[in-house]
Amino acid sequence: MKKKKTLAALEPYLWLLPSILLMTIFILFPIFEVFRTSMSEVSKAGLVKGFCGFDNFAKVLRGSTFKLVLKNTLVWTIAVVVISTVFGFILALVLNNKFRFRKAVRAIVVFPWATSLIIQAGVWKFIIDKDYGALNTLLMKIGLISSPVNWTPTPQAYFAWEIFVGIFVTVPFVTFCVLSGLQSIDNSYYEAATVDGANYWQKLFKITLPLVKSSLTVSTVLNIIYVFNSFPIIWTITKGDPASRTDTLVTYLYKLAFYKGKSGEAAAVSVIGFLILCLCASIYMVVSLRKEEE
């Protein structure tokens, strides 16, 4: 009997064992390796020479490039997440209403998110090209401009376009996360509010927002992780150039590892990014959960 009880108690863990093994191999072990590499002296060939403590972190933090890259990463993440959340929420409210061709509009909205980021970035890079771009060609044909306009005269302008592309491909994700929350709201809440004389804005802030808060929390946390670690858009459009002026942590550590052969420093940057990401996501989750409890 005791053996049967023991087996019954172990059964759930046996079912979970394959998942635990996969997580260990593909998630936990790589994280351990990155932490180990960040504290090791690594040759350009990728061979670990020995333990070096926090030397790699010191080299990274002392460099002026890292400060610029960190600032770019924070601007990139905050701008894309905040703006895409606002526009995604508004778009979800629109798509939640019944109107003609709603299904077709929803299919069009999801398209930027469903398409490869490399393709999206490549298309936008072509659109804003000064000499052959579709934007200049269109504006010249309709007579709004007489000669091609340089849409990216500075690194800051390039970075602004990258943020725009990031928002463009992220809005659909937020839209459908919020839309799923909106569709789960019982219409009786709105009917009762209408009877009580509530206007649209009162319904929005007293009923809609509180009831979709969980959907917004999930989409925001996933967006922070997704945008913070985004590589294809910036790499396809500028590769972080000129002089790392448009680099984020992900593209910067890629250059350190594969262009300069500094795997130890690249791992240190990766660890710093990982810790920042964990901190930001944890703070947001704690604040959101406390508000829900209140």
Task: For each feature predicted by the language model, list its residue ranges.
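A structural signal for multi-pass alpha-helical bundles of membrane permease subunits
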Residues: 4-294
